[in-house]
Design a protein with these regions (language model features):
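Flavin (primarily FAD) cofactor-binding/catalytic cores of flavoenzymes
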Residues: 2-55, 71-212, 216-218, 231-387, ...
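Flexible "cap/lid" subdomain of the alpha/beta-hydrolase fold that forms the substrate-access gate
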Residues: 57-61
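Active-site segment of extracytoplasmic enzymes that catalyze sulfate/phosphate-ester chemistry
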Residues: 64-65
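Short, surface-exposed amphipathic charged segments that create phosphate/polyanion-binding patches used
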Residues: 221
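The conserved 3'-phosphoadenosine-5'-phosphosulfate
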Residues: 384-399
Length: 435
């Protein structure tokens, strides 16, 4: 097939596979590209760009995360490991015959519009497994290369004589054997890895600059994210009610040494981990203040304390990274692209991003619904349908409010955060217009 009649789809992780399935389902011709030799993206630990580690599991339950049309087996754990998830994505790809649409081992080097017209074609330069470069033009582009691969590595004043790594380099707790370890950041990965370190390290401390809300994985013997949600509460009331319930189950993290959060619940992504509080309570992990400076093996903290470490592991998150596209194509505004519904580039008809969205409880089905909308829109553009033309006009205008009434922290990792309910409603309503 002539490539100018195809959509180029970049990535075969969860969002990329969702895109492939929906384009396939709606009869939109496409060519997929995946730099690795297999599907799974982040969840394929063998992928050089994967940042998962040996002990990694979902922090949301399988029933709140899976693709609705392809449920995980009952035999799969409530919170599956990366191994189970890779099996799941392989099975998903095989069940729907998606592999045949991909060129594996092929890295996209550059994506550029042929012109600045909204309906422009797109020129892709790729590098195959043999190192040969190839350039072709496509009708449109769907970017689904993930959001958790490019480390956000901080810099600290002073000089450090020990080992300084980002969690993206962490794979196994063997790294900690006999070492004095400082983990910087207490997000979900930081807390998971601190728990890993307890069993191998000589000492484990965790440095934080703000407080957190800690959500247990199980409540009354059931995955916590499967409870509640049937009654829609205003944001202010849900924050108050859920924070109270959390204190009943998890206690007050301030008593464990964490700062009191300077924000209300859900204004930043909660930490789904109660084991970290268990180990702090048992003296296995010590909470430290923010870092002031490094001095040899000594770390000096902003509360005036100091301690020596052999290894500092920065659990400081990731940056959005679309190196093959000029920032202006994606309408970058500050810390992230400004896209309509976190999907559509306002200046181009057929440039979309899947997976550039974060929300507590959105799951892969939320990304699938993004892909469903993209497939319907692209198909509608081909026929000039009224819903497609209406969406084309809407995405060039002011974006809808997707906050659900929450005041999210102005942090880089929150730059593309939305409220799950507000977001899914907006995406579903947009897709329903094509029915």
């Amino acid at each position: 097939m002539d490539t100018t009649e195809q959509i180029a789809l970049i990535g075969a992780g969860p969002s990329g596979l969702a895109g492939a399935r929906c384009l396939q389902k709606h009869g939109v011709a496409f060519q997929g590209f995946e730099a690795h030799d297999d599907v799974g993206g982040l969840w394929n630990i063998h992928n050089p760009r994967s940042t998962v580690y040996e002990s990694a599991h979902l922090i949301s339950s399988k029933r709140m995360t899976e693709f609705a049309e392809f449920p995980m087996a009952d035999s799969v754990a409530d919170y599956p490991s990366h191994r189970e998830l890779l099996d799941y994505f392989r099975a998903f790809a095989d069940h729907f015959g998606l592999r045949q649409h991909y060129r594996f081992g092929t890295r996209v080097q550059k994506v550029e519009p042929v012109s600045q017209a909204p309906d422009t074609r797109w020129r892709l330069t790729t590098e195959g497994p043999d190192g040969a470069r190839h350039t072709a033009e496509y009708k449109g582009v769907v970017v689904a290369n993930g959001t958790l691969a490019e480390p956000n590595m901080p810099t600290f004043p002073g000089q450090y004589a020990g080992e300084l790594l980002h969690t993206s380099a962490y794979k196994s707790a063997a790294l900690f054997e006999g070492k004095r370890v400082l983990i910087v950041g207490a997000g979900n990965s930081g807390c998971d890895i601190a728990v890993d370190a307890v069993h191998r390290a000589r000492r484990v401390d965790i440095s934080v600059r703000r407080g957190y809300y800690f959500v247990p994985k199980y409540v009354f013997g059931r995955p916590a994210d499967t409870l509640g949600g049937k009654i829609r509460l205003p944001a202010w009331l849900k924050q108050r009610v859920d924070a109270t319930i959390l204190r009943w189950f998890s206690g007050d993290p301030v008593r464990m040494g964490f700062p009191k959060p300077e924000y209300r619940m859900y204004e930043s992504h909660p930490v789904v981990n109660s084991l970290i509080l268990h180990h702090i309570g048992h003296g296995d992990v010590k909470v430290r203040a923010d870092i002031e400076r490094l001095d040899g093996h000594t770390v000096r903290f902003k509360d005036g304390s100091a301690a020596d470490y052999d290894l500092i592991l920065a659990a400081t998150g990731y940056r959005l990274h679309y190196p093959f596209l000029a920032p202006e194509c994606l309408n970058w505004q500050g810390m992230a692209p400004s896209l309509y519904l976190n999907i559509f580039a306002p200046g181009f008809d057929r440039l979309a991003v899947l997976g550039m969205v974060e929300a507590s409880g959105l799951g892969w089905q939320g990304r699938y619904e993004q892909a469903e909308l993209v497939a319907r829109y692209f198909k509608g553009l081909d026929s000039g349908s009224a819903p497609a033309l209406a969406l084309k006009a809407a995405k060039a205008g002011p974006p809808p409010d997707l906050s659900g009434g929450y005041r999210y922290l102005k942090l880089e990792r929150m730059a593309y955060y939305v409220n799950k309910d507000a977001y899914r409603q907006a995406v579903r309503q947009a897709a329903a217009r094509f029915a």
